[in-house]
Amino acid sequence: GEACHFIDLCSFLADSKVVAVCMNALGENPQENTDNVSILLKYENGTNAVINYFANGSKSYVKERVEVFSQEKVLVLDNWRKLEGFGVKGFSKMTGTMDKGHKRQFALLNERLQKGGEALIPFESIVNTTRASFACIESLKKKAWVEVR
């Protein structure tokens, strides 16, 4: 599903490969409910990431929220429209229109196809995200951490 996009984003922010995952779902029969899950990601460089993917919340709350904690600083991105910084010298808030980067991504892809050059996303990263996604389903079934190989 859509969780792979968030795994990919976390991997980009961590600048590392996922080495283990643990996924837990809500409900009495969680194996059949992947619309309400928490995914824990462990990275090769020691970074941890948590993805909470819930379809049972209020529609009035932001649909997508990213929080990054590092070196006594926090960045919070709400719906790709508002970015707030805490403990970031000289920065507190930025707002704008929603931009998930699709237009720029396709412009860069078109440029690469016409002129050549490196892939926008390294193949190894795509493979790691795919393996991590499959490992999430395995983790849900096993109710345990699963290594990503």
Where are the predicted features?
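A short glycine-threonine-serine/GTX helix/turn-capping micro-motif
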Residues: 91-100
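C-terminal helix-rich "cap/oligomerization" subdomain common to oxidoreductases
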Residues: 44, 111-149
